[in-house]
Amino acid sequence: MPQKVRIALDAMGGDFGPSVVIPGAAIALGRHPDAEFLLFGDSALIDKELAAHPALKKVSRVVHTDVAVSMHDKPSQALRRGRKVSSMWLAIEAVKKGEADVAVSAGNTGALMAMARFCLRTLPGIDRPAIAATWPTVRGDSVVLDLGATIGGDAAHLKALAVMGAAMASVLFDLERPTVGLLNIGVEEIKGGEEIREAAELLRAMQSPPFEFIGFVEGDGIGSGAADVIVSEGFSGNIALKAAEGTARQIIQLLRDAMSRTWSAKIGYLFARGAFRALRDKIDPNKSNGGVFLGLNGIVVKSHGGTNADGFAYAVDVSYDMVRYDLLTKINQTLNRETGALVSTPSAQEAVS
């Protein structure tokens, strides 16, 4: 019998806390019956939600704490107030102690990053982790990073992101040499700032890298699937992410409005319903929920704070897959082969939201 996947959940994280986290975990359990859960937070609120999900209750253990990190806490505040005692910290610490294989939180991104870095520590040479996620494209899926873990960063930081992102793509997509592109304002070699041009030179100079560097990729190349891995510093990456999510929701709403405007449109929708549903499912931001913190001595997955139960379930799916794919070990192996990419990035600033 395969070993259970042990998932630690910050039950108080996000805009809605247990009312989304617990139903979301129940949905994910239906897809992954070999999972079990550690639930950290207010036991009264958690037990109230668990009462409606007996199957989840059977494979869960609740650990009570009165302290929760709010969505408005600064990372420094969260560490001072929540270290050792908050639901977010305890979920991460469960990974450090070997009680869980992965931690998932929908809480404050800056606080989660600070706590994860402080508790788990980063891999040798990595100054700060990155947030990586799969991104739906016309060619399938790509890995995009950094989606907001750090603001800024030098060329060596971007090189390290490329190495980690390529390792993740190799594991998830079963690719021997995934293609890697640097997000830029143009594809010409003279475009972009000094850091990104220098990063391109560093990547081209790598000896037999486990990926193919294709150069610069513009913003429209993310959705077109121009590369298996798109690398950006966290400021630009987060803007791209939020813009894409907003566009996806706008398209879904515009289609819904157009299909309900007239009787002929409604009749047409009946004939094309399957195609419209497929499009909606492809671009639904909930189905791309779950960013993986790369560069840590442990696996932490970040869910959107405002997601619903279905969206949180997809974040749990991501955490499950990271464990089943043994992603951490495989990324570490790749990084160890490319020790030249593992350098500190003193210019990078910690994101706070």
Curated annotation (Swiss-Prot):
Note whether Zinc-finger occurs among the keywords: no
**One GO CC term on file:** cytoplasm
InterPro entries documented for this protein? FA_synthesis (IPR003664), Phospholipid_synth_PlsX-like (IPR012281)
Q: Where in the cell is it found?
A: Cytoplasm
**Which pathway or pathways does this protein act in?**
Lipid metabolism; phospholipid metabolism
Q: Which reaction does it catalyse?
A: a fatty acyl-[ACP] + phosphate = an acyl phosphate + holo-[ACP]
User: EC number(s) for this protein?
Assistant: 2.3.1.274
Q: Which GO terms describe its biological process?
A: fatty acid biosynthetic process; phospholipid biosynthetic process
Where are the membrane-spanning stretches? none
Instruction: Kindly name one Pfam family recorded for this protein.
Output: FA_synthesis
**Which UniProt keywords are given for this protein, alphabetically ordered?**
Cytoplasm, Lipid biosynthesis, Lipid metabolism, Phospholipid biosynthesis, Phospholipid metabolism, Transferase
Q: Which domain of life is it from?
A: Bacteria
Alphabetically, the GO molecular function entries are: phosphate:acyl-[acyl carrier protein] acyltransferase activity
SUPFAM superfamilies, sorted? Isocitrate/Isopropylmalate dehydrogenase-like (SSF53659)
Instruction: List the HAMAP family.
Output: PlsX
- What is known about what this protein does? Catalyzes the reversible formation of acyl-phosphate (acyl-PO(4)) from acyl-[acyl-carrier-protein] (acyl-ACP). This enzyme utilizes acyl-ACP as fatty acyl donor, but not acyl-CoA.
Concerning its family, UniProt says:
Belongs to the PlsX family.
Q: Which NCBIfam families match?
A: plsX
Summarize the subunit comment.
Homodimer. Probably interacts with PlsY.
What is the official name of this protein in its record?
Phosphate acyltransferase
- This protein's species is Rhodopseudomonas palustris (strain BisB5)
